[in-house]
Each structure stands twice: as structure tokens, then as C-alpha cells.
A protein has these predicted regions:
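Conserved NB-ARC/NACHT P-loop NTPase core of NLR-like innate immune receptors
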Residues: 1-191
Length: 191
């Protein structure tokens, strides 16, 4: 069996519009389900967690979920395990102490500290200060796609094409169209 065939992949997308996709508990639950579906041995570990919590009548806390994930990841003989966490910045930096985002960053740090040679993490996020500071000591490779000048040009080009092709704006003077493009590009702030 090749590495590609034996590789495990689990994916989680943080979504600011869906509170069920914004915290450590949701992340860990999703990763556990995805990984345990790959083999009976992994499913048995998850079933143990289920049994510990009165066959599902009690919800496991984040500590129990993390312990279960750790047990699954530590099973010998597994191929490469890729955990992809997309849009971490959509995990709210709320008023909780610690905030949902801080808890998530601590969970990621704990995953890295496991030091498992077959575990690979890929985390995507906008370059928000707290995330950058927390992840900086943990990353071994970083790809920055945040090129403000290129992003601003793309936004400007898009707005320009919409403004100049919109039938309702045909009668507008060119300098008014240019002002709209300039202001919208400015207000978009890279979004």
C-alpha cells in the first residue's frame, strides 16, 4: 500500500455564520468522526469514548475529545495523517476567558506538542495579529497569500469592470465612475 493510499485526511472549516463550526469542541468532534471512519481499530477508540459517556447520553468535554483524538493519532502503523483547518480567523475572538479563539489556538498548540512524526497540520487564516503570534512558534513552513498590493489591484479591476459594464451607470460621467471605483476599492480593505 502506498503512502497516498494509507494517508488519513480530515478537514474542518470554521464558519463565522455557523456557531456549530467555531470552537475546539466542534473541531475535535469533526476530526474524530472523520478519522474513525477509516478503520475498525480507530472506530473502536471512538466507541470507547461513547461508552465512557453513558452511551452518548452525556456529551464529552473538550478534554475527553482531545484525549480520544490523541489516542487515535498515537495508534502505531498509521500512515501520514493530514489535519486541515480552514479559516481559523472565523473562530470568534469573543469575550470569554479564554476566548473561543484562544482555546482553539491552545488546542492547536497541544496537537503540535504531541510531536507525532506522521501528523501534519495545515491551518489557513487571514493574518490576524493574535493568530500570527500564537502560531509563529509552532509552524515549520508558512505560505503567505496576503499580498495587499495584488489584492487591492484585483479588487480595483473587478469593481472597474462592474462599474463600466453596468447599464445603470452608462449615463454617469467618467470622473464619477472613477470616484466610485476609488472609494469602493478603499473601503473594501482587502476583502
Amino acid at each position: 500500500m502506498s503512502d497516498a493510499e494509507s494517508a488519513f485526511l480530515a478537514y474542518f472549516y470554521f464558519d463565522f455564520k455557523d456557531t456549530a463550526k467555531q470552537d475546539s469542541r466542534a473541531l475535535l468532534s469533526s476530526l474524530l468522526i472523520q478519522l474513525s471512519n477509516r478503520s475498525d481499530q480507530l472506530c473502536d477508540v471512538l466507541h470507547g469514548l461513547y461508552s465512557e459517556h453513558q452511551d452518548g447520553s452525556q456529551q464529552p468535554n473538550t478534554t475527553s475529545l482531545f484525549r480520544c483524538l490523541k489516542d487515535i493519532l498515537a495508534i502505531g502503523g498509521l500512515g501520514p495523517i493530514y489535519l486541515i483547518m480552514d479559516a481559523l480567523d472565523e473562530c470568534p475572538n469573543d469575550s470569554g476567558i479564554p476566548s473561543s479563539r484562544e482555546k482553539m489556538l491552545m488546542t492547536l498548540e497541544e496537537l503540535v506538542q504531541l510531536g507525532l512524526p506522521n501528523l501534519r497540520l495545515c491551518v489557513t487564516s487571514r493574518p490576524e495579529y493574535d493568530i500570527r503570534i500564537a502560531l509563529e512558534p509552532l509552524v515549520t513552513q508558512q505560505v503567505s497569500l496576503h499580498d495587499e498590493s495584488g489584492q487591492k489591484k484585483d479588487i480595483n479591476d473587478y469593481i472597474t469592470s462592474v462599474v463600466h459594464s453596468d447599464g445603470k451607470m452608462k449615463r454617469w460621467r467618467d470622473d464619477d465612475k472613477d470616484m466610485v471605483v476609488e472609494k469602493l476599492t478603499q473601503k473594501a480593505d482587502g476583502m
